[in-house]
């Protein structure tokens, strides 16, 4: 039901295909990447199958099967999962009303939204918000990543001292990205970084460009095998995309940023503080855009024993 209400059965539908694998012909991945980007930007409104097929430049008759083969989900289940995950983020991090969240996520009424949310997460939107965004159903919890396992035992005062937050304004940037699925298998992400670095080196844009990662998915609610991460490179110098890559445009935006140096546990703790410690006590709310992990030491971006990063959360003033 792409052009209407969310299908609350998305969890079952997600099992109707094998886990997604990169197609041998990269043009298939590029076209489906365009569809995913289009869907993420239009979750607030009905989107017809014909529209998505046109974005992908595939026959409407075959598009549904191609999408399922590449993504591991039906178009319906994928779209409705994105809507529910966006709703979960808004419930956790914004003060919007349930009605406003329902409309922002493509539901025609708060009652319809509440039914779909309960079917997806086994809790009501109100209960989810009151619990601080905790999913209590043990079956669902097994499917998602638990960031708490990675957090360092630091007091609130220690976090404030260790992770000072600054506001920065970044201009529009253009470049390329490689989208990786099932990113909790770290080798997949590292291979994508290696591919990106080798490519931009060959195009002579590596020294002056920016290497970063981002994800529009939420590890608190997205099943691990469906979690997507984009390995990105932007440059003021033009360069063409490699065969596994798609074009990227990051709009100008304000970010709350933390500079972090350390292992993956320190990175996870810094992200947790930025959102749960700083954001909810600030005069800002998150923009509907992914956070960035900018690699300050590009030469060693594939060495994941130690990170030098700017963690950047897109924000705007609370209204």
Task: Name each model feature, range by range.
Residues 66-69, 77-78, 85, 89-92, ...:
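A solvent-exposed interaction/effector surface
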Residues 8-23, 46-82, 102-124:
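Basic/polar phosphate-binding segments, predominantly the helix-turn-helix DNA-binding elements
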Residues 17-47, 80-96:
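A short, Lys/Arg-enriched amphipathic alpha-helix from helix-turn-helix/homeodomain DNA-binding modules
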Residues 39, 63, 274:
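Conserved hydrophobic/aromatic pocket- or pore-lining residues that grip, position, or stack substrates
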């Amino acid at each position: 039901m792409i052009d209407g209400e969310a299908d609350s059965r998305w969890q079952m539908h997600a099992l109707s295909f094998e886990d997604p694998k990169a197609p041998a012909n990269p043009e298939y991945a590029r076209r489906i990447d365009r569809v995913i980007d289009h869907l993420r930007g239009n979750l607030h409104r009905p989107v017809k199958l014909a529209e998505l097929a046109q974005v992908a430049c595939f026959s409407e008759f075959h598009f549904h099967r191609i999408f399922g083969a590449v993504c591991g989900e039906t178009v319906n289940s994928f779209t409705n999962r994105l809507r529910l995950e966006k709703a979960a983020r808004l419930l956790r991090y914004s003060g919007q009303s349930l009605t406003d969240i329902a409309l922002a996520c493509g539901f025609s009424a708060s009652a319809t939204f509440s039914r779909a949310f309960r079917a997806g997460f086994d809790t009501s939107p109100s209960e989810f918000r009151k619990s601080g965004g905790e999913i209590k159903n043990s079956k669902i919890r097994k499917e998602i990543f638990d960031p708490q396992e990675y957090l360092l035992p630091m007091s609130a005062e220690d976090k404030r001292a260790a992770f000072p937050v600054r506001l920065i304004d970044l201009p529009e940037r253009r470049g390329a990205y490689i989208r990786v699925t099932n990113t909790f298998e770290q080798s997949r992400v590292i291979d994508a970084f290696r591919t990106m670095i080798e490519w931009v080196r060959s195009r002579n844009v590596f020294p002056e460009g920016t290497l970063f990662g981002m994800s529009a998915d939420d590890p608190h609610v997205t099943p691990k095998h469906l979690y997507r991460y984009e390995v990105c490179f932007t440059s003021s110098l033009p360069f063409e995309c490699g065969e596994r890559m798609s074009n990227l445009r990051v709009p100008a935006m304000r970010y709350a940023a933390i500079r972090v140096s350390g292992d993956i546990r320190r990175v996870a703790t810094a992200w947790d503080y930025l959102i749960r410690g700083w954001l909810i006590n600030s005069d800002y709310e998150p923009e509907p855009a992914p956070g960035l992990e900018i690699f300050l030491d590009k030469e060693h971006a594939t060495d994941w024993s130690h990170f030098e990063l700017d963690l950047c959360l897109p924000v705007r003033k609370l209204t």
